[in-house]
């Protein structure tokens, strides 16, 4: 299996548990929507790493892994000099860090975050599956209408469930660091169109701030209206290039369009 796809599937695995045969029950997002209330307020703090303490764990967050055979990236709260942030380190590894959360993208369409890339694996390229690593990614998982899934996507859900006993979300957007691809480049995963990568910029050594309209990006990437967001995560990986990567992540929040 493509290691990049395996990583994203593992994100879905972390979001959900076992379920029955109906296709909608094979979506991790179905259970999350049933379990969680939509976040309210003027601003949704999806990740408040700055409120933590260096060396402690981030409440409500957990790791998702590529496979039992893949080495795992490390995530820890650290002091950055300007506050506490989450640091991800990969050494030929590929795993991420996530939390389950329910957000209405129509009410809070704008995502804001910052990251600082400190080390990049050589030879990465998000447009080439065999080199699709990134020192920094922000991952957004969505619920959706299972009836819209085509035969291939349904087969992928059932196969994944049969092999692992776990589930995937309906769709995923990955906001990715890249130095060689133009900002705004959208790349579909080579195995499923329900995973789309959007390049947001490059740069090494300095903090970069980002703002994206998730509602507009979803429409552009998938050609349909998004349902609720059901998960937010980050990922620092070097599993394809077998190199080293290191990045720091600041807080992640959602707000209405100004």
Predicted features, each with a name:
Residues 73-96:
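Short carbohydrate-recognition loop motifs
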Residues 107-157, 161:
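Extracellular-facing segments of soluble proteins and assemblies that are Gly/Ser/Thr-biased and enriched
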Residues 49, 210, 232, 252-254:
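Extracellular beta-strand elements of beta-rich domains used
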Residues 133, 143-190:
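Extracellular/luminal beta-rich ligand-recognition
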Residues 22-68, 151-156:
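Extracellular carbohydrate-recognition regions
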Residues 25-30, 135-138, 195-200, 204-242:
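Extracellular beta-strand ligand-recognition surfaces/modules
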Residues 100-111, 202-205:
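Extracellular/lumenal carbohydrate-interaction signature centered on repeated Trp-anchored short motifs
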């Amino acid at each position: 299996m493509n290691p990049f796809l395996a990583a994203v599937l593992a994100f879905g695995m972390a979001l959900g548990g076992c379920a029955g045969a109906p296709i909608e029950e094979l979506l991790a997002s179905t259970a999350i929507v049933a379990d969680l209330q939509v976040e309210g307020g003027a601003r949704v703090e999806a990740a408040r790493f700055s409120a933590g303490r260096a060396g402690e764990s981030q409440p409500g967050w957990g790791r998702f892994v590529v496979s039992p055979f893949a080495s795992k990236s490390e995530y820890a709260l650290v002091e950055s000099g300007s506050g506490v942030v989450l640091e991800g380190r990969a050494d030929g590894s590929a795993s991420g860090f996530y939390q389950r959360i329910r957000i209405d993208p129509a009410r809070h369409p704008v995502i804001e975050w910052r990251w600082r890339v400190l080390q990049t694996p050589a030879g990465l390229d998000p447009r080439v599956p065999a080199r699709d690593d990134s020192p920094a990614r922000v991952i957004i998982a969505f619920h959706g209408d299972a009836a819209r899934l085509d035969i291939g996507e349904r087969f992928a859900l059932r196969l994944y469930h049969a092999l692992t006993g776990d589930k995937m979300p309906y769709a995923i957007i990955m906001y990715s660091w890249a130095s060689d691809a133009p900002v705004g480049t959208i790349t579909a995963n080579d195995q499923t169109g329900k995973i789309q990568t959007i390049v947001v910029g490059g740069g090494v050594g300095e903090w970069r701030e980002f703002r994206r309209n998730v509602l507009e990006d979803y429409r552009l990437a998938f050609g349909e209206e998004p349902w609720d967001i059901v998960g937010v995560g980050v990922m620092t990986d070097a599993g394809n290039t077998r190199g080293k990567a290191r990045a720091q992540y600041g807080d992640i929040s959602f707000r209405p369009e100004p």
